[in-house]
């Protein structure tokens, strides 16, 4: 059996490379061997949050997996089929649900049947896009490419206890190329600010700070305030903002102990303003996540992203090892960048 061999230490050498390698293996049905997994890190090898993505995709593709244990620096993944049906994934504690969705969505839309997943874990946690970003920005922006998927938030989960619940429904999807380089005009900035098991004033202060910062730039703003004392294991708070353009541009900020609510709102608004001022169609989060879909859509795509990240650069390198494509990148890490590729397409 021939494996695609991936050096897990390439680029940042983190968990993102592992997740996308398993995702691409699941879509293409090509066995993959990943070595040097997180060897640059203080705690090298697989961590529990990485194993969650591997095992979730193994269930969906009925894969054979070797080396799937905490601390392992090498892993083999051999997918068998693109299965449909209903699955439950319990990440445990506050592992990011959004990062699991990043890994499994390409396989879900490549399946021959509809897939429904109920995922438990963290919805709003550090170092990962919040679930509201995934629903209101990522999936909204992926719809014109042909991605047929929707998210339903049932309960929020924050670090360190998690306990969030999200449902993902995905249908077989034919992907289309896109040409979106420059940022589109928009009428309003929309958003959702939440606080759970915290005083109501927290959500009000975060929202007011974001609104004030954006209105000083002459923007119309509407932010939904979500406050509850439900069965959430909490506490936690955060805000996600987005333009009503097509594509949407988004930004976010999490609350944390010791960070004033006003700073949370102002930081999110400032991040959004920076994304808008870059003048590109997609924000930097989208730039990280859209790469595989461009390669899987048959035909030429061209997109502009506000800032090329090391994650996006690594994803380009990785995709070129699975698919017969070559990306053209005009720009560089940390700068507005135009990415072009002749997508290979994927026959379902």
From Swiss-Prot:
Gene3D superfamilies for this protein: RNA 3'-terminal phosphate cyclase domain, RNA 3'-terminal phosphate cyclase, insert domain
Any one GO cellular component localisation term in the record: cytoplasm
PROSITE patterns, A to Z: RTC
Pfam families: RTC, RTC_insert
A single MF term (Gene Ontology): RNA-3'-phosphate cyclase activity
Reactions listed under catalytic activity: a 3'-end 3'-phospho-ribonucleotide-RNA + ATP = a 3'-end 2',3'-cyclophospho-ribonucleotide-RNA + AMP + diphosphate
InterPro entries, A to Z: RNA3'-term_phos_cycl_insert (IPR013791), RNA3'_phos_cyclase_dom (IPR023797), RNA3'_phos_cyclase_dom_sf (IPR037136), RNA3'_term_phos_cyc (IPR000228), RNA3'_term_phos_cyc_type_1 (IPR017770), RNA3'_term_phos_cycl-like_CS (IPR020719), RNA3'P_cycl/enolpyr_Trfase_a/b (IPR013792), RPTC_insert (IPR036553)
EC number annotated for this UniProt entry: 6.5.1.4
One example of a Gene Ontology biological process annotation: RNA processing
Active-site residue list: 311
Keywords: ATP-binding, Cytoplasm, Ligase, Nucleotide-binding
Domain of life according to the entry: Archaea
Kinase listed as a keyword: no
Residues bound to ATP: 102, 285-288
Subcellular location: Cytoplasm
First-tier enzyme category under EC: ligase
Segments crossing the lipid bilayer: none
NCBIfam families reported in the protein's UniProt record: RNA_3prim_cycl
Function, as annotated: Catalyzes the conversion of 3'-phosphate to a 2',3'-cyclic phosphodiester at the end of RNA. The mechanism of action of the enzyme occurs in 3 steps: (A) adenylation of the enzyme by ATP; (B) transfer of adenylate to an RNA-N3'P to produce RNA-N3'PP5'A; (C) and attack of the adjacent 2'-hydroxyl on the 3'-phosphorus in the diester linkage to produce the cyclic end product. The biological role of this enzyme is unknown but it is likely to function in some aspects of cellular RNA processing.
Family: Belongs to the RNA 3'-terminal cyclase family. Type 1 subfamily.
Protein name: RNA 3'-terminal phosphate cyclase
Organism: Korarchaeum cryptofilum (strain OPF8)
